[in-house]
Amino acid sequence: MEFECQERLEAANDQRSESGLLNTDLRIGNDGSVEIPNVKLCCQKKKGTLVPSGSKQLLSDKDLSTTIIDLPQALISEILNCLDPKELGLVSCVSTYLHRLASEHHAWKEFYRERWGLPVVFGAASSGLSDERSWKDLFVEREFRSRTFLGRYSIDTLYGHTEAVRTVFLLASAKLVFTSGYDSIVRMWDMEEGLSIAASKPLGCTIRALAADTKLLVAGGTDGFIHCWKSLDGLRNLFDLTGFQKEKTEFRLWGHEGPITSLALDMTSIFSGSWDMSVRIWDRSSMKCVKTLRHSDWVWGLAPHETTLASTSGSDVYIWDVSSETPLAIIPDAHEGTTYSLARSHTGDFLFTGGEDGGIKMFEIRRYGSETSVVLISQWMPHTSPVYSLSFEFPWLVSASGDGKLALIDVRKLLKTNRCAYSKRISSSTVEPPQRMLHGFGSNLFSVDVGYDRIVCGGEEGTVRIWNFTQALEIERRTRALKGMRHENRMRRRRMQMEMNAKNGRPDQCSIAAHKNPINGERNRAWHSKRRASGKAKA
């Protein structure tokens, strides 16, 4: 791989100090621009050549033979900040100096956060995470892992529920799966082994929503209550669902006047949506309802992000400002019929909806000062029945439908980041992202969740299935290892051949071949010559 600059930045080392172009003199503005005081650069006739405008002495060709690595480190860092992950990886292959700058650049943390949020590490492994592994290593591993959803998989089927499963939740950081449904029992499963860990007592009504983090587990019932479990320090599986522990960790929140259909958590709040046409926001410290967002129809789904919250009510989608309890934007009739499901990217800028018409839509939330607008980006029709559930983990959007199928949609090409302008831009490509359909259910699928290399779903059959893609992950790792070994062997043979040629005084045969057949237009002319000799080329 090689790094190509469209406009080569050249400056003389001996002029840089005289002109004041030093690391300590650089100032980075609020808009991301770099201010270079006391120096004005003008462009000479030679393309890409930058010369101080006040300089009286012309620079010689020898002085102008510098490269980008001769720029101040702060300026190079700002240039690297304008690159995407692929480009930043290419830069790290140019030289040892650029490899160090690119590998340690702070942009890798931002790349990771934009796609998956900051990592939540559970257990003893959380100590020393930043010291042991760089953000680049974490990003590369997560990006590599996300590609395995197109590979082989195995299916674990979990039995235990006696009736339909209405909701599933995957807590990947603790390797736990929570499920519940018409039998009113919340069950906890081991994600790795697929074994039942614990089950709660019957809660008295259908459980239609679950949400959890490492501190709190909440379940929403059709009787309008939120049943909560606090985690216990030192307990391997976090939550005491059975009530065997001496410490009391269970309690209920009351306030809704109808069945609870959706739940979500953040660091400070609990969000609950209900058929009473409201979304309630509960403070996690006092466990009191602090805000209520009123809708015009039943609430089916919600997705909070920082100070905003997206919700579906009837066929409409709302974007709320939580602090003022007012809607920033409304998408009327997002789907034909009810809009059942909702998912959101970690940046909060992209929204995914699924509806009764079997369609899935992707919207971008754009903010211009105090104004907020929502723009349709793309849409798909992968299902023949209503889309009851959506789950998103970059770059995969996973949907569960009444037709008994799961659809995997890669939205990578639709999420392009222009870091230099600190804004989002949407790819103009009209080609739909690749899809993968997962079959195996003969009836309705009501809920799905995705995390790392697992997809968990539940439906009318009363079973829970875990689609395990670790097999594809191991195959891909072995393939990469073999490719690396082959490349290393080729390079070793190449070096040995060069050493032998140098000892014998013979020219390098590969260099001669490259000189005779350069990788440029010469190859095209040879191809056209063959084409003229053999007549018209076939289409």
From Swiss-Prot:
Keywords: Repeat, WD repeat. Residues 505-539 are annotated as: Disordered. GO terms for cellular component: cytoplasm; nucleus. InterPro entries: F-box-like_dom_sf, F-box_dom, G-protein_beta_WD-40_rep, WD40/YVTN_repeat-like_dom_sf, WD40_repeat_CS, WD40_repeat_dom_sf, WD40_rpt. This is F-box/WD-40 repeat-containing protein At5g21040. PROSITE patterns: FBOX (PS50181), WD_REPEATS_1 (PS00678), WD_REPEATS_2 (PS50082), WD_REPEATS_REGION (PS50294). Residues 526-539 have a biased composition (Basic residues). Coiled coil: none annotated. SUPFAM superfamilies: F-box domain (SSF81383), WD40 repeat-like (SSF50978). GO terms for biological process: cellular response to phosphate starvation. It comes from Arabidopsis thaliana. WD repeats lie at residues 160-199, 201-239, 255-292, 294-330, 334-373, 382-419, 433-477. Residues 65-111 form the F-box domain.
